[in-house]
Each structure stands twice: as structure tokens, then as C-alpha cells.
Amino acid sequence: MAETKIIYHMDEEETPYLVKLPVAPERVTLADFKNVLSNRPVHAYKFFFKSMDQDFGVVKEEIFDDNAKLPCFNGRVVSWLVLAEGAHSDAGSQGTDSHTDLPPPLERTGGIGDSRPPSFHPNVASSRDGMDNETGTESMVSHRRERARRRNREEAARTNGHPRGDRRRDVGLPPDSASTALSSELESSSFVDSDEDGSTSRLSSSTEQSTSSRLIRKHKRRRRKQRLRQADRASSFSSITDSTMSLNIVTVTLNMERHHFLGISIVGQSNDRGDGGIYIGSIMKGGAVAADGRIEPGDMLLQVNDVNFENMSNDDAVRVLREIVSQTGPISLTVAKCWDPTPRSYFTVPRADPVRPIDPAAWLSHTAALTGALPRYGTSPCSSAVTRTSSSSLTSSVPGAPQLEEAPLTVKSDMSAVVRVMQLPDSGLEIRDRMWLKITIANAVIGADVVDWLYTHVEGFKERREARKYASSLLKHGFLRHTVNKITFSEQCYYVFGDLCSNLATLNLNSGSSGTSDQDTLAPLPHPAAPWPLGQGYPYQYPGPPPCFPPAYQDPGFSYGSGSTGSQQSEGSKSSGSTRSSRRAPGREKERRAAGAGGSGSESDHTAPSGVGSSWRERPAGQLSRGSSPRSQASATAPGLPPPHPTTKAYTVVGGPPGGPPVRELAAVPPELTGSRQSFQKAMGNPCEFFVDIM
């Protein structure tokens, strides 16, 4: 049984549909086709079919008679279904499409963009009155209808600033709906499409309705392809592309007498609208463009000398460029700078962020230098001696610290400072992603560029060979790093900057400190194997008090009795002020001397340090704090316990210092305090183990 294949394009969908009718091709009618589409609101569509005209060739013919036979080609029928709201035609007219210059693939895959017949005119009465009374249609069809209405209103309202037409539809349409295309009144006037179009075309002298229709539908099709991208308005489609979002136009004049060749390769862009411009593909070393350094890959070439490339095809642009290069004299190149100088591929710069990102550190440094908001480095107040002694070295050694005052770089400058300046965006050193053996090396530099930069920007190099040695030193010290960790420097290799945080290991906390008040004054401790001198003069020379102590204090004394701080009362407490626990006022010293024969006595009368006076009670002179200085020692070992040190056997009974109170033996300690004896004996065994000074 014979059958007919009907391929039809539905509204804005790019993929066509295929149905088969059990009817011979020469007998199939529009009614047969509509019966197959019973699940669709066919009365809301207009039907166009591929047909052959004797004068114009292949056209799209509208058929509205259900009994009319459908045109067939090679045993199949090609049709386009167009929403009635988006099309107006003269009843019974058989149109001819004027844009036959477009290739057939675009005609087939462009959806309804190319489906307007030449008789399309907004002022002609519509032949579909009453077609919008359908209220129970599917939600998909309603969505399409609303989308078409919105698109029509936008186009009619924005066509070259002309007011929207006052023609209203009688039924089913909102009162602000209007016709959608250019009318005959707009002949001989230029127009610009809506702002949503990313690449705006320039057209003038639209004298034929068919031409106007073709251009508008062409814009509509282009908008559908770019629906997800909100573009910017521009003056010409040939110069507005992704690579020129920054709108930074640069004119470079090159002196060809110094260089033998221009040194660029160009890339052309083409699309269905024609050629889209000439772009810089790559830059060759040794050429005039590479020596200038302002033109980068991805820049769009707008003009060479006095020849404008905007409205020129790619072939003509290449021909003109070759002719200009073959001539003598300087060459002026006008380019539109690419937003990203190192794109992974051409024309992939995102439109969402057309601004080059700033460097926050450089911005902060610049703002602080102008406003004076930050103090000078090295003079800011610090809260501790450690911070004071290391603040200047931290400032000079931390690579990330911004310098408010830029000094000229010399061979004697810190390497980290040279590398920091080298990494600045405007340093002049080309830092970008490189390809090596199909591996992308991010933010890499060429060794030759590093040597040239050092020789140019660092003072003190008499010849380039010295700059090369300096670059080798940068590699040796880790400021530069080879891709495969080679230690020999080569000008032909790619290098990346080393991890700057590793330089923190070279910090010196003592550098930059001055004065004794900023330094720790710990006294030397005796060797653990040496005898611990009890009751004898101390052979160690202890330094005097720092000048920051008040005049009421004298040289740190060493109490042999109960002169330690209130931290003695707790068994497990630890004194953080060990070197100060044995200091006493001159008045207390006299009282001790006066009470030398009267035993230990009570110390509750004396003035105690702040916060601990209430806890001072009468206590034996032999009791010592665990946290007090090891220089404050007690009497002999208690009976029944092993001696703490072999050399302490000779010191069984020890008297206090001259004029001081006598020292009781450890065995005479009251029972309630015997719990601390064991820890005391351990501390006496090896005092260096238990003596910890807290800075």
C-alpha cells in the first residue's frame, strides 16, 4: 500500500517531525494531514509547504483549503506550522520568499525564522479572525502563544524608535498587542533591532517589504540561539564580539626598520551572517609586535594604517594586510583589546563579567599610601617583647607584606622584594599559562623574559650575563621553580614562582631588637651533674634588674626561708614569676635580720604582694614552693627518704644566710604538708627538668 511521508517543522522547535499517511503522494490533502495532527490545535496554526514556482524556484506556499492537494517532492511533503498570531498573509496568496540567497540548511533548521511569505504585511486584514477563541487548549500551546505575543510586542515597540501601531485585534488579544513588522511607511529608513540582540546589525534603505520581513525574522532566529546570554548594545555587528567587551581600543605604531617582520598570525571568524572580523592568533618572538608588547593574542584587528577592517571580509582583510606589510615605513595597528589576554580558546570570554578583576593587595596598598590610613611598617606598637623584637624582621621578610614606600630595586635588594615586584600585573613581565608537551603550566614565565626583566628593572647589572646569574640564584633559593624541578637555569625553559610562604622559615626573631628591655634575661642553670650549692655563696653572676622595674626593688635576692609568693600554699600550683618570688623590700630585710634568733616568726605583719596577702600564714622556714626558683633552696633530706643527690650528704644541717632566720629540716614539716615532700625531692634531684620559664 502506498504511503506518504510528511516532514513538518513545529513553531520554534529546531528538530522536525515525521508522520506517515496511508495515502498515495499524489492524492494526499491538507485534511489528511490535519487528521494526523488531531492531538494539536491545528486551527491555531498556518500551514506552509515546500513548493516549486516557475519564476522563483523553491518557495514556501501557504495552503489553507482542506481539500487542496499537498505538493510532494521525492515522495515526501515538507511543511512548516506557524502560529497564527505571528503571521499575516493575504488570503489565497501564493508567496515567494525573497531570501533564497540563504543556504538550504539554514532554511530547514532555522525553525519559523525563515517561514514568512513575501506577501507578509502588517496593514493587511487578518484572515484568522476568531481563531483566538480557543480556551481549552493544551498548556504547551498557550505558553507558545503567550511567548509569541510578548516577542511581537517587543519588536513592534522598538523598531528604530517608531511608535507602536494603534491597530487592535478584535477578539482574544490584550489591548496592547500590535503588529510585528515593518510596514510600507518605514521604507527608506534605517532601523536597529531590540537591545536584547547581542550583535546589532546596521541596515539602511529598506525599500521592500520582503527584505524587511527577512531581516526581522533573521534577528529573531539569532535571538533564539542566544537566549541564555544577555548581550550588550553596540554599533556594528562586525566589531562587537566576545573579545571586545572591554571596549579598550589601542593604536600601536611599529617601526619596521628595526625589525624584519611583523610577527603575527591572524584568525578569521565567520558565521551565517558573514565574516565576523580578524583576530590576533599568535605572536612570534623577534617580530615588531612582540617587541612592542601591547598587542596580545585574542585582540581584534580593527584598522591597519588608514584601512578600516570593520566592514571588510576576511579574505580582503588578509590581502590588504599583506600589501601593507610589503611596503616600507611604519605600520599603525588599531586593535580592540581582549578581555582575557590568555584565553583557552578564541571567543570564549564570558559576557557576565566584562571587567578585569583587581588585585586586592595592590588596591589596598595604593589606597593606604594615598590616605595614610596605615602606620609605617616597623613602628607600630606591639604588645609583647616577642612581637617587638620580630616586627621589623617580619615586615622585611614576609613576602606578602605590601610596601607603602617603593624603593628602586638593586642587586642588593632582598630577593623576595624583587620577586614581589616581578609578579605585579603591571611589572612588564609576561606571566601567563603556557603549553609544554600538552601540559598546561599555569602562570609561567620564560627564562629569557626573566633575565631581560632583571637586566631592565634592577639596578647594578653591568651586563646581561650578571642578570642571568641573578636569575639562577632565584632558582637556587626557591623563588623560581622549574616544572620538573631542574636546578640549572636555562633561558629556554618555563618557570613558575615558588611558594612564598616557604620564606617564613628564614625569619629571625632577634633581628631588629635593641635595648635590654626587649630581650629575655634568663640566668644560666647549673649542670644536673654538678653539686647543688646549699648554704654557700652562689658562683653564678646574675644580671641586675631590667631598667623597667620600679626603684623600690633591689637586686633579686634568694630567700632561704618563707619569702616566696603565695603560690606556695597550693600543692600543685606553679609560679610564673619564679625570678621575682625571692625579691623583698629593704624594710623586710631589716626585720628579718632583727628576728634572726627568734625562729621563723610570722610574716602576716609584712606587706604581701597584691592579691596574696590574705593567704600568708605562719609557715616553717624549710618549706619551699615547687614553683619558686631553684636558687631558693632548703635544708637537709628528710629521714627515711633517699638523698636527692649524692653530693648533698655533707649538707645535713644547713644554716641560713648571715643574719637570716634558721632553716628547719624537712622532717619537721607538719603532717598536713607532707604530701608535697615527694614532688619537692624530685625537683631537687634534677631541677632543670622541672624549671620552666614562661615568656
From Swiss-Prot:
Q: Modified after translation how? A: Ubiquitinated; undergoes both 'Lys-48'-linked ubiquitination, leading to its subsequent degradation by the ubiquitin-proteasome pathway, and 'Lys-63'-linked ubiquitination. The interaction with INVS is required for ubiquitination. Deubiquitinated by CYLD, which acts on 'Lys-63'-linked ubiquitin chains.
**Gene Ontology BP annotations:** axon extension; axon guidance; canonical Wnt signaling pathway; cochlea morphogenesis; collateral sprouting; convergent extension involved in neural plate elongation; cytoplasmic microtubule organization; dendrite morphogenesis
Q: Does the keyword Amino-acid biosynthesis apply?
A: no
Location in or out of the cell:
Cell membrane; Cytoplasm, Cytosol; Cytoplasmic vesicle
- Biased composition regions of type Basic residues, renumbered to the chain: 142-151, 215-228
Q: Which GO terms describe its molecular function?
A: beta-catenin binding; enzyme binding; frizzled binding; identical protein binding; protein kinase binding; small GTPase binding
Membrane-related topology note: Peripheral membrane protein
Q: Where is the composition biased (Low complexity)?
A: 176-192, 200-214, 551-580
**Ubl conjugation found in the keyword field:** yes
Q: Which residues carry this modification: Phosphoserine?
A: 194
Which segments constitute the DIX domain? 1-85
**Composition skew (Basic and acidic residues), residue ranges:** 152-171
Domain named DEP is located at: 425-499
**PROSITE patterns, alphabetized:** DEP, DIX, PDZ
Q: Which disease is it linked to?
A: Robinow syndrome, autosomal dominant 2: A rare skeletal dysplasia syndrome characterized by dysmorphic features resembling a fetal face, mesomelic limb shortening, hypoplastic external genitalia in males, costovertebral segmentation defects, and renal anomalies.
Per the record, the domain comment is:
The DIX domain promotes homooligomerization. The DEP domain mediates interaction with the cell membrane.
Tell me the subunit arrangement.
Interacts with CXXC4. Interacts (via PDZ domain) with NXN. Interacts with BRD7 and INVS. Interacts (via PDZ domain) with VANGL1 and VANGL2 (via C-terminus). Interacts with ARRB1; the interaction is enhanced by phosphorylation of DVL1. Interacts with CYLD. Interacts (via PDZ domain) with RYK. Self-associates (via DIX domain) and forms higher homooligomers. Interacts (via PDZ domain) with DACT1 and FZD7, where DACT1 and FZD7 compete for the same binding site.
Family statement drawn from the similarity comment of this UniProt entry: Belongs to the DSH family.
Tell me what this protein is called.
Answer: Segment polarity protein dishevelled homolog DVL-1
Q: From which organism does this entry originate?
A: Homo sapiens
* Encoding gene, per UniProt annotation: DVL1
